[in-house]
Regions:
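A short, Lys/Arg-enriched amphipathic alpha-helix followed by its capping loop at the start of a domain
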Residues: 2-12, 31-44
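Short hydrophobic/aromatic-rich motifs at helix boundaries and adjacent loops
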Residues: 4-8, 25-28, 45, 65-70
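Active-site phosphate-binding/coordination module
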Residues: 33-129
């Protein structure tokens, strides 16, 4: 990258799990917090991109993201509006549940405001813990 090209940056995208959040420590690092603050102070739009649903997007004290790409960009929004929504077709959801059942893994199904799982294992519990949440296991 050219030395002068940094001033041309208008938006920065960040994944949550493994990028913003250290997966071993389950927290955002102080260095990342400072980096995000520096970008924001320089007028760069901060975008969080994640596979998580909107209600599982973690918040980070002192950091104000502008745009959120949730559910792997199938649901995109700002604080004021939904920009894009493209839910997974029901037939595909059924196939995912069946395939997961065959390998004895729980599945969490979710919408914009919440969801539930057909069971829970350590991987799923750890994933929810990053957003300071618990798996909602349905009967």
């Amino acid at each position: 990258m050219k030395k002068d090209s940094a001033k041309d940056i208008k938006i920065a995208f960040f994944d949550v799990d493994g990028t913003l959040v250290d997966m071993k420590k389950k927290v955002i690092t102080p260095a990342m917090v400072e980096t995000l603050k520096h970008l924001k102070e320089n007028g760069i739009i901060l975008c969080m991109a994640t596979g998580r649903g909107p209600y599982l997007v973690p918040s980070f004290p002192g950091i104000d993201f502008d745009v959120f790409l949730s559910y792997n960009a199938s649901y995109c929004y700002t604080k004021d509006e939904v920009i894009f929504s493209n839910p997974i077709p029901k037939e595909d959801v059924k196939a995912i549940v069946e395939n997961a059942s065959e390998i004895h893994r729980p599945v969490f199904l979710a919408g914009v405001e919440g969801g539930g799982a057909n069971g829970c294992d350590k991987d799923l519990a750890d994933y929810f813990a990053i957003a300071k949440s618990k798996v909602n296991v349905l009967d």
